[in-house]
Amino acid sequence: MAKKKFSALEISLIVLFIIVTAIAIALVTVLATKVPAVEEIKSPTPTSNSTPTSTPTSTSTPTSTSTPSPGKCPPEQGEPINERINCIPEQHPTKAICEERGCCWRPWNNTVIPWCFFADNHGYNAESITNENAGLKATLNRIPSPTLFGEDIKSVILTTQTQTGNRFRFKITDPNNKRYEVPHQFVKEETGIPAADTLYDVQVSENPFSIKVIRKSNNKVLCDTSVGPLLYSNQYLQISTRLPSEYIYGFGGHIHKRFRHDLYWKTWPIFTRDEIPGDNNHNLYGHQTFFMGIGDTSGKSYGVFLMNSNAMEVFIQPTPIITYRVTGGILDFYIFLGDTPEQVVQQYQEVHWRPAMPAYWNLGFQLSRWNYGSLDTVSEVVRRNREAGIPYDAQVTDIDYMEDHKEFTYDRVKFNGLPEFAQDLHNHGKYIIILDPAISINKRANGAEYQTYVRGNEKNVWVNESDGTTPLIGEVWPGLTVYPDFTNPQTIEWWANECNLFHQQVEYDGLWIDMNEVSSFIQGSLNLKGVLLIVLNYPPFTPGILDKVMYSKTLCMDAVQHWGKQYDVHSLYGYSMAIATEQAVERVFPNKRSFILTRSTFGGSGRHANHWLGDNTASWEQMEWSITGMLEFGIFGMPLVGATSCGFLADTTEELCRRWMQLGAFYPFSRNHNAEGYMEQDPAYFGQDSSRHYLTIRYTLLPFLYTLFYRAHMFGETVARPFLYEFYDDTNSWIEDTQFLWGPALLITPVLRPGVENVSAYIPNATWYDYETGIKRPWRKERINMYLPGDKIGLHLRGGYIIPTQEPDVTTTASRKNPLGLIVALDDNQAAKGELFWDDGESKDSIEKKMYILYTFSVSNNELVLNCTHSSYAEGTSLAFKTIKVLGLREDVRSITVGENDQQMATHTNFTFDSANKILSITALNFNLAGSFIVRWCRTFSDNEKFTCYPDVGTATEGTCTQRGCLWQPVSGLSNVPPYYFPPENNPYTLTSIQPLPTGITAELQLNPPNARIKLPSNPISTLRVGVKYHPNDMLQFKIYDAQHKRYEVPVPLNIPDTPTSSNERLYDVEIKENPFGIQVRRRSSGKLIWDSRLPGFGFNDQFIQISTRLPSNYLYGFGEVEHTAFKRDLNWHTWGMFTRDQPPGYKLNSYGFHPYYMALENEGNAHGVLLLNSNGMDVTFQPTPALTYRTIGGILDFYMFLGPTPEIATRQYHEVIGFPVMPPYWALGFQLCRYGYRNTSEIEQLYNDMVAANIPYDVQYTDINYMERQLDFTIGERFKTLPEFVDRIRKDGMKYIVILAPAISGNETQPYPAFERGIQKDVFVKWPNTNDICWPKVWPDLPNVTIDETITEDEAVNASRAHVAFPDFFRNSTLEWWAREIYDFYNEKMKFDGLWIDMNEPSSFGIQMGGKVLNECRRMMTLNYPPVFSPELRVKEGEGASISEAMCMETEHILIDGSSVLQYDVHNLYGWSQVKPTLDALQNTTGLRGIVISRSTYPTTGRWGGHWLGDNYTTWDNLEKSLIGMLELNLFGIPYIGADICGVFHDSGYPSLYFVGIQVGAFYPYPRESPTINFTRSQDPVSWMKLLLQMSKKVLEIRYTLLPYFYTQMHEAHAHGGTVIRPLMHEFFDDKETWEIYKQFLWGPAFMVTPVVEPFRTSVTGYVPKARWFDYHTGADIKLKGILHTFSAPFDTINLHVRGGYILPCQEPARNTHLSRQNYMKLIVAADDNQMAQGTLFGDDGESIDTYERGQYTSIQFNLNQTTLTSTVLANGYKNKQEMRLGSIHIWGKGTLRISNANLVYGGRKHQPPFTQEEAKETLIFDLKNMNVTLDEPIQITWS
């Protein structure tokens, strides 16, 4: 409850009262004694009403009037400053006072260090030491010395007792007069044991007296009071002790920011007080005098408890020394020794008895607030949290339910119906009410007597004034009040009766007792006479308590209770109230445990009640500090403790409350509560997800938590446990207090800072598993950066423990009926243990009466034993263990057997095993409680875990398999499982060294011949080096290479930092494993293992490298270029070869490109990408493990991993490394026509004229190699001699022209051929190694003067008519110069062109010239052309080696720019890549414009310089469908300018319908070209078809041209930032798993969805509608579908197109070509989302200049829709062309159903009223701006209403 808010008048009166009181006291003392008042307080004159009853003055030594001789001070030289014991603790020191007290005066440069400290003349001497009662007894006589506070007691008695082997007590009392002692009901006198049987020795020094307690085992001194004097006066007791270490914990209640105490001269006052916790040392609600310390890494610890309830302070200084300064009572110390910190806590709790066993429902979540205002509000909060499915057991009401805040009443107006509401709560959970101790003295609201007060008066139950008979009147919430004296047995009877009577009205279930420090809003009492009793209310020494006034905000210190004066028992008020409430609960709920929550506590309070940490504030700091408070109360024996989640005072925030609810779900006591006047903060108010999720986990773990409370009750163990209790051998754990444990086994890591998703967390030395995934974490005894996004808290299970669980529900009543389960977290020895306690959850003495079930669990040797050690709770036997999850197994599980003890084991088939994460999940068990059971699991070798060890060409037999060392197991003919596979223990390399670095890891591997018994192809490399580099936080590299010899590495430059740049925020963790060797990469956020090569089969041989990795899911995409059957890879035992080849697309046929890159989606929705930078021939095998195996025939392993976390972000990260894609010119997005086999220029000219006449959009014309003379590059044939003039003509019309170039240069010419001759001069051609001989393959060029015979076979034609050609070596500098000149000369001397199409650059060869014949053979180096044993799974011609099939010989040589040589064997797959950039450079240097290069062969980074088409496809429906897959894949690979030849290259379609669909689909390829071949296909250009098809072609192409501004903007986004243009649905909707396999639909960017028909004879198409708002592009209408499959109508002339709500698409009216369309009006399509919001951008430039973005020569405009306002913002204006920026119309889609009557346009600083039309049924609104001269290069704003 909140601190009372005083008015300004009240504050003024209080201050005035204090001043007047102080003056009065001073005057009284001066007048009465004629000496200064300060001396009188130190030595008061005894009076009948001023003497504490506990300390009669007659036993005190009078204060001396003469100053004794000063004591001896230590020499200044070498004085131990930190050992000074302060001699003036009550005020700022002065030299005069110091000398008066006989102390040493030495000022210091720091005021926290005492300037005045004790000399050796204070204290006591010990005399008459005798042995008795298992201890010593001695008289201690005061050493004559000046007094500090007067009334020093001359002689005291020391009594020691060796109570137990690990507990020692010493007590110092007044032998002559009974002083006040704490009447603790559970602390019993002990008989003690002989000193010889203890763990400690005790030494008492006599002159001066001091006592030491020494641990026998190591002679460590645990307590040494010789460091300071003993002072013992009537109202001031002081003793100091030196501590054995700096690590101490405890004392309370206060706000301690850290669990370990700060030793730097800190004062902590202890005196119970109603005070708001804050950033200070104020005394708070409790009085806890216990502390403990740890001595060393052996765990040996100690504790000290002072049994004293008087006001005191403890002073801690760095030595370390603790000084107690106490205002009364006696000194009664208990010292505990334990072998561990946990043992010390257990021993302390044994002194005052262990905590009560809570009811099971007490562990459920509770919801409360101060001042709901009415029962209706409470009901609404309950309703919404129930509806949200929040696990929630108890609703609490604060004092606002009462009538005028009177106890045992309820407000019958605001809370009318409360009894019925309580009954409803019982049907769903529990109801808790608050009770304060203060009882109003006023009548009820209706004027009736307040019977609770009346009955209390009758029984004389109140705390009285100093006369012992007059009830003391204070003030609290009800107004003027009296206070029950709970130390009086009559009061306990009255209180129990009142509780019972009220329960008869309102059936509550538990009691929350508050304000019991005890709190009063007036100082002392209404009658101020008590405050004038100086010695109690103004003692000579007042500890550093808040206000420095003993009765501040409480009762007068001379008030009388049954146990004594308030001066002595004040701090016991809450403790005694808890005892009384416990007895009341026993009456109200006979034999039930109920629930008691108290604010004020004392040692032993946990036996009676639970505690919360008080009226905290909604702040991040207080959330953090709450962990220390929780851990401290675990020390104090109050394990059911927690802070108020989300904070009590001040408005919380959503983020703070979310994070606090995550933490609060793991407080032992979990409650959300806040104060009046502040915002609501119940879980359902902020949204249920995070709160519900973690409360559900809490409820799942309640059997574990309940068992921990059983152990706390039985053995005094802690529940919320600091690290040091479990990991005391690790000094890092001694200071950790931002994380904690549940018991020994659950690690909780909360987020305690705003805006943070990465937490610096310490992971102790154990095996840990992610609770939510079961995945084993690699961390151990290290500080890590734990990724915890907004909806996550860190939860980790400790290996070696078994956690009982239960299927959760929304209340414990419901959940207790659900099946039980076990989570077994195995340790390093594959062992674990655990326990379950189960009873009815509420009976008072179920443990004492043995009415419970107790299990112990253990695992060893692959066997889990569930041993029921006690069973006397019959009702519990209906429950059963149904599930068991085992984490951290090392081997796969083949079978499970289960059985009850002494019965036959039976096979159990209901289990799954996660091989990747080694998690066994067993379901459908039926282990009823009370029985004992065994579960055994047997290891297996799953088919899915078999990695083939015979990938060679040909079929293996059992003999060849076993000879190699493989395992053999025949499989059925239908199975793809390999019959030959690696043994699981296969481990040919030993990890010999590993070196973690801040920037990565390095390691060395050594071939281990005895283990390398499997002989893989070629010779193994003996020594390998592993290098892991942490590049940016979202990317890493790991590389395996020959440590002793340089091997070929790919000479392709990547954009990676020169030095790693990652920080502790990186998204991944990497481990290098051994036995077997492997690299593991985990995503920090989920713990998911996303790369795990710790698998059999790793090999690194000279010409055979193999590595396998597990995949995190079955969702994998990429690898190419190969025709795939779907976008998602089929992992059912498929192998795909990669080696660039002149191969038309076909199933499993390696084709033109080489892309060893994949992207994987993890089951959680995260994505990552992996690139293997290797250019040698390879294949990859997928298997359903899921796993992937790479095999390559050379180079090294050089992997790059991109962590995303979304598919599109992972793709962008990959593109950033390989280079962002080239920006095509605007015209390159237009429709393009080509054909292989144009006969002459006239045929092309006729086509062009027909297309223009039909007004079909069309931008680019091509010619294939037919335009050349005999297919010779840089020539024009006779039939095309007029082609240059035709090209000039159409270019004037705005058209563009692209010509083809193949790399092969003929060497058989009889006439001058400059291209060849200059090539010879420049030495540009590929040669045989170590010679000057050119390699002479044959390709397209024909021999001169040869007649072509078209009747012979292809091979015969190659021999008869094809010329010998030389291939330029594009790696050479000289070649780049030569190529640039040939292109330049051709452009300037023969014909103009705008782009270049480079073909046949795999490179393709039809054969090799050998001895006058074309043979598919090479000169030598058979191991290169026919790699030993293994060849990747590649397409070959019969009789050919895989490497040389349609390729140059592998031993031919290339020269790199640095002059080094490489073999075709290594760089074959780079040939096309090496040609693309020189071609683009030459094109741009020649034309001065951007141009475009289209390359058939590609490799990673090709997209930086060129586009690609999908090759020589077929006119089939199958190829149409496959084109979508290829287009999506090439976007992944960084080549967004991609398309297939529309309608195919080969074969006639046979049906016009295929053309209909082909042109519809092709209109939405980024690269839209038709290019059939003459020999196999009819003309397919639009004008070659009937009029209907022509119109349909025109219609769909006009849609494309309309959208080109949007599409061009998407190409710019990819060029500037990477990412896809043609986008899979999953890239935008990755959290919707339905999208993960879709490829027959695609997106343009984020906003435009294409759903084509790709099957014959269909007039409908079924497509998925992702979870967003979608509009039909053709109509603008909202289709009102989300997240479902839907069948759309698809007539032959229509393709389904949809625009995504929330986006704005810039468009432009179409025209015959882009040159003309760019001059038409722009328009905007504004598609509103469900919130009437949308955004979009437009990128504009001149469409053809080079590097416009890089040079700032562009316009960038941002559009935003907000409800009914559309604005544009010009972000960049480096390109100005108003003609191209004219805005003609704006189309608003999804505007809403209200009719629009008014619109305003603000443009150019003026307001306009634009004309508009609307269709209310479609919710569309169209603004016509054509007559308003609006251009987009200036901002606009349109509003409508």
UniProtKB/Swiss-Prot annotation:
Q: Which residues carry this modification: Sulfotyrosine?
A: 401, 410, 1387
State the residue spans of region: Isomaltase.
120-1013
Query: What does UniProt list as catalytic?
Result: 514 (nucleophile), 615 (for isomaltase activity), 1399 (nucleophile), 1402 (for sucrase activity), 1512 (proton donor)
Q: Which residues lie on this side of the membrane: Lumenal?
A: 33-1841
Q: What is its main location?
A: membrane
In this chain, substrate is annotated as bound at 274, 398, 599, 673
Disulfide bridge positions per record: 73-104, 87-103, 98-116, 646-657
Protein name in UniProt: Sucrase-isomaltase, intestinal
Source species, please? Rattus norvegicus
The root-end lineage is: Eukaryota, Metazoa, Chordata, Craniata, Vertebrata
